[in-house]
Design a protein with these regions (language model features):
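N-terminal glycine-rich phosphate-binding loop and ensuing alpha1 helix
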Residues: 1-58, 67, 72, 106, ...
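Short amphipathic helix/loop within the catalytic HATPase_c
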Residues: 61
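Conserved beta-loop-beta/alpha segment of the NTase-like Rossmann-fold superfamily
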Residues: 64-66, 72-142
Length: 142
């Protein structure tokens, strides 16, 4: 999940370079995920950062993975739920997965774009998902 502005960080840490050649943290995860066998990535972002995110990450990633976008919007809630007065932030991980639901067509994994997991984590989850399915492709949601 790639969301948007980090309130404590003071910017969009998901697209700020950290590597020696300008890599962002999610570049390392995407590399590991692709090597493990994941072919599709769904970025869950806010509409406000769409252009900047695509320019910094999405356009480049689309050369090696199938890239889809889902947009987490505060007012898109399951029936019976309402937004509390004064709430301005998205709802978190479950809400992000709900926003990505139309793009998910099989087993999937969820990670945060600003965390590093390492290659073994992707291998383990891909191996599990690909052996416990009906042959559907696996997807990673960021």
């Amino acid at each position: 999940m790639a969301a948007g502005m980090g309130s404590r960080y003071g910017g969009m840490k998901q697209i700020d370079p950290v590597g020696p050649c300008g890599q962002v943290i999610v570049d390392y995860s995407l590399y590991d995920a692709r090597r493990a066998g994941f072919e599709t990535v769904i970025f869950v972002i806010k509409h406000e950062i769409e252009e900047a995110f695509k320019a910094a990450i999405g356009d480049r990633v689309s050369k090696v993975m199938d890239v889809k976008y889902a947009f987490q919007q505060l007012d898109e809630l399951p029936e019976g739920y309402t937004i509390p007065e004064g709430r301005v932030k998205p709802w978190g991980t479950c809400h992000a997965v709900l926003a990505a639901k139309p793009c998910i067509h099989g087993p999937f994994a969820v990670i945060n774009a600003d965390d590093y997991y390492g290659p073994e984590a992707f291998k383990v989850i891909y191996d599990y998902l690909s052996t416990h399915t009906d042959g559907e492709s696996t997807t990673t949601v960021w």
